[in-house]
Every structure is written in structure tokens, then in C-alpha cells.
């Protein structure tokens, strides 16, 4: 396993570090609040080819690997870019998988996003890009849906992310059955991996902000960074950053292997876990912990200034806290990982979603045709309209 970046990947890193340094950063993030989207910067990002770079070249994309994409989004996180880079990249790849990646998606002219949790009733709730995406892709049971209708109403949140609920009304079917479930599951693991890379970028900059501040801030005639109590707060953070970066790189590596048809191993008794779904979840948990602790400690050493809007660290603190819990409570993600490694625990109650949620449903529902209007899960069984 070689997790070192190639020469081409280092070039990608430098190109996008320069781009986000110019077109993103704390000033642009403040200007994009509260929705968390800068349309001018997004138009300029389109010129780099980033929105479609993860789509296969045979479909008009850039043919980038998942590892390539982690390089890009780490820089987006480091510069706290108010752009839906992760969600658009992941959703474009998913749409390409089911043969529905339009040119507007490839170029970024149409912003798309992924519903990271199943619908509740006739609504997909808390979609990460729901307030800016023209199309959201959601999985309802075994049916993969395209939810159009334009951006939803922004849900205020401390992280200033473009969250919104999106109604399923008017959704069309992209695919259904086990292949649709597998494609969405793969996309969700890619989302975990790229969100982890974003959190690594946030951690990196937050650590730099804290270290730079304690070098400059003087008290009692000395830089406060010379005091042991301050040093102890920051000393272990580089190790957390390295661990999060390592797991994220390993998850991306496993994802690229899986895409090439090389299955991984998920066995708690094995010293070398190579299963993509397992590593993606591990990376998200560890990167989330690293980002929340690092931004917390960095804000702490800023003293009262850390809480003021004029200082940049509060932007990273809020973004880290939001991203770390956006998918789910980290404790539940850890439980999911335990199920993957040790086998599922006995259920303590009825499932909340999926085909088993309706005990009366037919085991082999009539498949929906691609592009058909979606009439809700009941229509798969009874043919009734919603």
C-alpha cells in the first residue's frame, strides 16, 4: 500500500491551493453567510473543471480517482471555501453510474447534491446542499430518485452550510433494485471520505491559526506560547491531524481499489482492514474528532478573541462542528462500524426505513422504469398513486 501522493497529485494540490487561496478564504466565507454559497467563486471553479473531474473520461469527465478528489477538497476545507465541492463531485459520479450525468452537471452549471439520509414521509430532510442544488439524488427504499424543483428554503445552522429540506413531489426514478442501493451506498462512502478530507483541511488550518497566535500574543512580557500550559493544549494536535489524514488517504485508496474491482477485507481480527465502507466510516469519525478538538483548542488559546467574529478561528470551529455531525451522531457511526466489523447486533426495535420497514410489502415489488414519475413507496407494491 503506497499512500504517498504522486507527482500529478502534488501538482493538483498546488493548483487548487492557489485557486482557493484566491477565490475562497475567511473573507469570502463571511460574505457567503448565512447560506454558505458563493456563486461567483462557483462560476470560477467551473473553469477549472473540478465539478466533473471525478466522472470517467468516457462520459466527458476528467477521470480523476477518489484520491485525486481528496487532494482537491482538503484544500477547499483548509481555505473554508463556501462551495458544495464534495456533494457535487460525489453526486456527479453517482449520476454517471446510472447514466444520468448531463453536460450541465459535468460543467457545474447545474449544482447537484446527495441526500445522505432516507426520506421521511414525502420529504428528504437536511440535505447538505439542499439550499443551492437544482437536483438532489435520494434513495427511498430501493428506488434511486432525482429530486428536481430548484433550491429549497435554507435552514439556519451555526456552520453556515446550505442545508434545506426537499420535497419528493415530482421526483423521477433513476434506477431501482439492488444495483440502485449499491450505487447509493458507494456514493455515501465517497461522501464520507471526501468530507473527511475536508475536515483534515479544516484541522490543518485551525492548528496553524492557533500556533501562529500563541507565537505572536504576548503576556507578562513573553509570547503565551512559551507557557507550558498553552503548549500542552496544542502538543498532541499534530498527531491527531496525521492520523486523520492517514485514515482518509487509506479510505480513498480502498475506494479506488473497490472501483477497480478489488474487494477489501473488513475483519476485526485482521490487522489490515481494506474494506472501503469500513475505512470511510473510520476516517469520518477520526477526522471529525480531530477537527472538533483542534478547532476547540485553537479557539481556546485565542482567549476571548476566539469568540469574536473578527477572528477567523471561529469560522473553522463552527464549520468543523457542523460537518462532524452532519451525517449522524458519531456514536451511531461507530455502532455502524462495529456492525461491519463484528456483525450486526440484535435489533432492539423495528427498522425506521428500507424494505423491512413495511411488513406488508411484497418481497418482489414491480420495478419502476427509469425516468418515470415517482409516486412513493406504496406505488411499488399496490400501484396506487400518492
Regions found by a protein language model. Give the residues of each.
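FAD-binding core of flavoproteins
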Residues: 80-86, 93-208, 212, 345-386
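Alpha-helical interface subdomain recognition
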Residues: 1-79, 187-365, 369-386
